[in-house]
């Protein structure tokens, strides 16, 4: 296999993540937290209380490793979405939504189409836990709107809209979301400049 990530753990130390506004520093070995790229320090356990008092977030070595492993899997999960995995997911969905699966597969939604939809969502970091909503949206988009099955981009656009709560939750912190707005005229220009090519939508400015 090929290496996709690496990191280093100092088992006799704790990892202290630096706060945004460091007022006091603690002694330690400077490093970068591997999962999110946060400036950090490996500190001795006896310095834990001091680090936390200064605003550092202190993490055990095992938690660092598990976090790095989890984030690495998330970033590359789209590469793991094989045809066999799609079949397994559909078989599990049949247990909770048998009528939907009977209508959708394989007459309207092919396993190949669902694989492409799920892969695109995972590549964007969107959770596919709500598989029933994803499949139902694909089914409705294709059967009711008469959308060509080959137009995966438009199908995924409909799925994103159906997963709006899941997606917005990803960017919320304590129930609040930070946003950036642009001038309405610029927004219209960008929307009107959207073009569709072989590789999906792009801005033709």
Spans of features found by a protein language model:
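Membrane-embedded alpha-helical signal segments
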Residues: 1-205
């Amino acid at each position: 296999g090929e290496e996709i990530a690496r990191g280093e753990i100092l088992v006799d130390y704790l990892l202290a993540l630096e706060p945004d506004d460091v007022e006091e520093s603690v002694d330690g070995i400077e490093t970068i937290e591997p999962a999110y790229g946060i400036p950090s320090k490996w500190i001795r356990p006896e310095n834990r209380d001091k680090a936390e008092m200064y605003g550092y977030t202190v993490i055990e070595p095992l938690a660092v490793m598990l976090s790095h492993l989890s984030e690495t899997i998330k970033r590359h999960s789209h590469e793991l979405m094989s045809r066999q995995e799609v079949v397994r997911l559909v078989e599990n969905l049949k247990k909770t939504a048998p009528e939907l699966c009977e209508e959708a597969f394989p007459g309207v939604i092919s396993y190949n189409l669902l694989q492409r939809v799920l892969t695109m969502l995972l590549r964007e970091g969107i959770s596919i836990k709500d598989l029933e909503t994803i499949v139902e949206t694909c089914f409705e988009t294709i059967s009711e709107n008469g959308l060509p099955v080959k137009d995966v981009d438009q199908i995924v656009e409909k799925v994103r809209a159906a997963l709006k709560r899941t997606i917005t939750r990803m960017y919320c912190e304590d129930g609040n979301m930070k946003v950036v707005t642009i001038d309405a005229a610029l927004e219209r220009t960008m929307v009107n400049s959207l073009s569709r090519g072989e590789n999906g939508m792009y801005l033709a400015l």
